[in-house]
Each structure stands twice: as C-alpha cells, then as structure tokens.
C-alpha cells in the first residue's frame, strides 16, 4: 500500500470525528511514529510504499483512533515544553496551555537561583512543590530547567505516580547535574496529613477544575479516555482543590514564596478570592494567547 493512499484513507476515516486538518495531522503523526516518515513524505515521494510488516501495526492503531482514543495514548507519548513525555490513560494528557505556567515559573525560579548562585556550593537549592502532578510534566520541566532544584511532586494515584516516575530523562539529568523529582503519594485534599516537606520557594499545581456541568461542552475523546479524577470537580464545590492548595501553601511555602496554579477560566475571580482569604494579598490572573484566564499567581 502506498503511503499517500494510507494518509488519504486514514484522514477520511477520522473526518467524522475531527475537523479534516486535525484528522490528517493525527494520521501523519501515526505514520511518523510507526514508519519514521515526515509529514510531507507522501507528497514528495508519491510512490513511497509502506512495508507490509508495518501495515498491521498501522491498521491496529487506526482502529483505536476510529474509536476516538486520543492519539497521544495510541502513540504512548506526547510533546511538552520541548520534551517527550510518556502518557497512558492513568494520566491527563499535558496541554500546551500548561507550558505557559511552566515558562513563567521557570523565570521566577531562575531569578531565585541567580540571587543565590554567588554563594556557590553553599547556596540553598531552589525548592518547588508540584501538587496533582499526574504525568509529572510540570515537576520534570522545572527540575530540568532550574539547576540543582529540588522538586517533590504529589499525587494520590499510584498509576499516575508510576508514569511520572518512569519518565526517561536520565541522560539530561546527568548532563545538567541536576536531580530527579521526588514523587510522593499523598491526598492533596488532606492538607493536615503527616508529611515532611518544605519550605518551598514555589508551589505549582494543575488541579482538577472542570465542573461536572461543563462535560456537555467537552469532546468524547477527553470524556471517554482521560481520567475523570484529574479533570472534574463537583458543581456544588468547584473550588475545593484551590482551598486545599492554599492550605498546602500556608503550611509549606516560605513567606517569600510564590504560588502558581491553573484555573477554570470561568472561576478565576472566585479562585482569586480563595487565595486572598488564605492571606495571599498579592494575586494576579494571567491570560493566555487566546485571552482566556489561564492561571493565578499568588504571594504575600
């Protein structure tokens, strides 16, 4: 079978589920993974023939995609902040929007690092706490971006912690002489549990924040495949994770520390009220490139 034929047929098979451009992109991602082709190979090499030994793998993957399983789960990985992260249905697929939080957190963390660097080997490392870590994308990004940083990361799910701890960045850790995040099982909603942590320069989180009533506006590939516990909160108490994050911050973040947490764009102002009530007088809602409320920064 010609690659061009497969791309055309695969795109058509997914067009009832996705816009044509997205359907085509998904098929090309699959071909790149299985065949090692580029997204233009079928155009510049119209006679490119798919190895018969590879066809069963492509066809099996297409069957999963036709059931609207996210392509990231089918491939077993996704890109985040310039790195490849393993993902499976135990963890939320990292979104590009979360890269904005990481970008700004790295800027803040590097500012602390530069302030301390004149002390050389005696300098205190930048300490960062990641709550609701999921795939570990935030924790790993911070650990690999801020030299010598210490990054404990918390989640309640054993399966998620296994994915997070299993991310393969050993060579980058070694080349940068930095430290692997420490992945800890704990319930973020239980901020009083016995746990030795802190003090932290930053507390970061991408908690569940989508209200149950918002499900009707969401795609099937999210609702049927991504973990509900990482996405949804009850309509009658949608801010419960933010109250918990505020308590963790009160308990473990240093007085000079800064917190950053993703928010539900429709509940940003209410979320801001939670942190102000917890004693964080300085808050800011940061918008993304689509001008949507994306995350909150809070500090004393």
Q: How should each PLM-predicted stretch be described?
A:
Residues 1-35, 40-43, 50:
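Non-catalytic accessory regions of SAM-dependent methyltransferases
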Residues 14, 109, 168-172, 249, ...:
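Conserved hydrophobic residues forming the short capping helix/wall of the S-adenosyl-L-methionine
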Residues 31-108:
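Conserved AdoMet
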């Amino acid at each position: 079978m010609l690659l061009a034929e497969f791309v055309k047929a695969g795109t058509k098979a997914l067009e009832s589920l996705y816009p044509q451009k997205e359907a085509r992109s998904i098929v090309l991602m699959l071909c790149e993974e299985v065949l090692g082709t580029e997204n233009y190979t079928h155009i510049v090499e119209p006679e490119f023939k798919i190895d018969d030994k590879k066809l069963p793998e492509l066809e099996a993957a297409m069957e999963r995609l036709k059931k609207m399983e996210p392509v990231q789960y089918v491939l077993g990985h996704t890109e985040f902040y310039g790195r490849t992260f393993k993902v499976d249905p135990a963890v939320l697929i990292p979104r590009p929007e979360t890269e904005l939080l990481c970008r700004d957190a790295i800027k803040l963390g590097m500012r602390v690092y530069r302030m301390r660097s004149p002390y050389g080997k005696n300098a205190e490392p930048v300490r960062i706490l990641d709550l609701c870590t999921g795939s570990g994308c935030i924790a790993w990004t911070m650990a690999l971006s801020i030299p010598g940083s210490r990054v404990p990361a918390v989640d309640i799910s054993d399966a998620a912690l296994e994915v997070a701890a299993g991310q393969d960045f050993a060579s980058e850790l070694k080349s940068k002489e930095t430290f692997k995040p420490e992945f800890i099982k704990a319930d973020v909603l239980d901020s009083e549990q016995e746990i030795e942590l802190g003090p932290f320069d930053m507390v970061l989180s991408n908690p569940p924040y989508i209200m149950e009533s918002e499900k009707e506006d969401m795609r099937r590939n999210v609702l049927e495949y991504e973990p509900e516990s990482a996405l949804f909160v009850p309509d009658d108490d949608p801010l419960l994770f933010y109250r918990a994050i505020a308590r963790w911050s009160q308990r473990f973040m240093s007085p000079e520390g800064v917190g950053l947490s993703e928010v539900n764009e429709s509940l940003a102002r209410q979320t801001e009220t939670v942190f102000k009530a917890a004693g964080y007088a300085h808050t800011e809602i940061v918008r993304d490139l689509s001008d949507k409320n994306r995350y909150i920064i809070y500090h004393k």
